[in-house]
């Protein structure tokens, strides 16, 4: 349920109403907008009579919320959220550019790539230390060694680091060492992991599951937020359809849908969606045109030699060319780099 206060509602009126709701066992999420304050009410709201609140001083109107997701709901939080990733903002007018290799392989590879993507305009370094693979025989990542290499690349470049987490057991380690914790598509509904991540305050990059609906995706965001962490960034990375030419089908309509339904920022991963590096540039530009708050793109300093996903990785030169085109497009959609 949403309670919208009048613009002239006093602090005393708002505070009294919040106390009354909490006495009735409700959780109250308070959001101060430009013109008025909005109270998001969570709990067994079926036992509440909306008319009882309409007669309270300072109340403008009461609205039920039919969507199953609450904290991620734009009705609860009408203004766009901007997530601070160790100094880099995700959301708002400025585009966030995550870039780096699919997997961290060695010191030279990660530092060379990091320096080159930073020079091109990327502001967050991505790289996999733990790799969830379809085959148990495929390269699984360097794990803790890879995490240490990412930290060295961060120290060298000053870029915040983003890497994927696989297990709730790793949350404490990642909370200490990583700037943005990525939850991959396979773990979007790993509710134990999501709840554990809710105990941190680190930004969580939540990728959409292979076959997840938009509602399911936003409910997974709610798992993190309901546990106490409001810093969630959504990532559209393609969904599984009947088409087999590309790895996945990039659902750009989801960007607009999520923007309408939720206040959370949403970025796009064209690399995993296409699975083919020659598609990445056009899909990236389309994502920005569709309203994405940023991109996460795989870049490798030698794609033919990559241990993982070389076919979808751009070279540093290709990435620099892409950023130049994004820079030209950004003002048209009222964005900046």
What are these regions (language model features)?
Residues 132-178, 182, 190-193:
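N-terminal active-site wall of soluble small-molecule enzyme domains
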């Amino acid at each position: 349920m949403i309670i919208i206060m009048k613009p002239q509602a006093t602090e005393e009126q708002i505070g009294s109403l919040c106390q009354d709701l909490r006495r009735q066992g409700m959780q109250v999420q308070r959001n101060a907008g430009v013109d008025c304050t909005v109270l998001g009410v969570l709990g067994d709201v079926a036992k509440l009579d909306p008319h009882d609140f309409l007669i309270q001083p300072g109340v403008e109107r009461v609205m039920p919320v039919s969507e199953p997701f609450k904290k991620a709901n734009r009705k609860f939080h009408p203004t766009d959220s901007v997530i601070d990733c160790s100094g880099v903002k995700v959301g708002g007018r400025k585009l966030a550019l995550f870039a780096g290799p699919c997997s961290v392989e060695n010191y030279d590879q990660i530092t060379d790539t990091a320096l080159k993507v930073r020079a091109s305009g990327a502001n967050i370094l991505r790289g996999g230390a733990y790799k969830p693979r379809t085959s148990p025989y495929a390269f699984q990542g360097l794990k803790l060694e890879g995490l240490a290499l990412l930290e060295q690349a961060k120290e060298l470049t000053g870029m915040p680091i983003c890497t994927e987490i696989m297990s709730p057991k790793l949350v404490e380690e990642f909370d200490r060492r990583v700037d943005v914790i990525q939850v991959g598509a396979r773990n979007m509904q790993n509710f134990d992991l999501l709840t554990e991540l809710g105990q941190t305050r680190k930004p969580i990059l939540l990728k959409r599951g292979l076959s997840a609906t938009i509602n399911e995706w936003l409910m997974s965001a709610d798992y993190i937020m309901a546990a106490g962490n409001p810093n969630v960034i959504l990532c559209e990375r393609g969904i599984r359809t009947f088409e087999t030419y590309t790895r996945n089908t990039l659902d750009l309509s989801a960007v607009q849908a999520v923007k309408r339904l939720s206040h959370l920022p949403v970025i796009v991963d064209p690399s995993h969606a296409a699975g083919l590096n020659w598609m990445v540039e056009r899909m990236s530009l389309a994502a920005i045109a569709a309203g994405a708050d940023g991109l996460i793109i795989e870049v490798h300093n030698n794609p033919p030699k990559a241990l993982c996903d070389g076919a979808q990785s751009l070279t540093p030169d290709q990435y620099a060319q892409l950023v130049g085109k994004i820079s030209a497009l950004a003002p048209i959609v009222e964005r900046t780099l």
